[in-house]
Amino acid sequence: MLKLAIGGILCFISAYLGIIGKSYYDKRYRYLSDFNDFLLLLIDGISYAKDRLPEITKKYIASSKGEFSRNLNNYIVVIESTQEKEKISKCFDSKYLKKIDKAYLSEFFTALGKFDYDTQLSRLNLCKAEMEKTLIKAEKDCKSTGNLLSKLGLLLGIAIMIILA
């Protein structure tokens, strides 16, 4: 009876760890998807509506939830007080992003608003093209690796239970 109880607990722990792994990939995809949505809003706001950058950003923050929105809010606070590169890069230091994604976001938001209209628009379109590739890869990772981790966690838990029984 004790072995069965321990096996059940270990099965639960293993399945829970698998779900946490899946959650990581889901949240990473959501974060990058939110950034892509912001990027599209930014391109539309700059090219068609001719809005200013803080207005576009505050409009996005008001209509969105999630970690990217919170990081964007921190970015607005930092931009209004100072423009130090180190503080800007800390705004987008999410545990769900890879190092290359963090560096990319830091570079993007540091350079945002520092160019003339045409250059800024071409950089945004280039960023949009790169982000589409990254988003496709993140979605693929979410569907394959994330789902695999949750199933593998449950399967490992059942295997532990069988071994202990």
Residue ranges and their predicted role:
Residues 50-117:
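Glycine- and small-hydrophobic-enriched helix-loop-helix hairpins
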Residues 63, 70-71, 133, 152-153, ...:
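Short alpha-helix boundary/capping motifs
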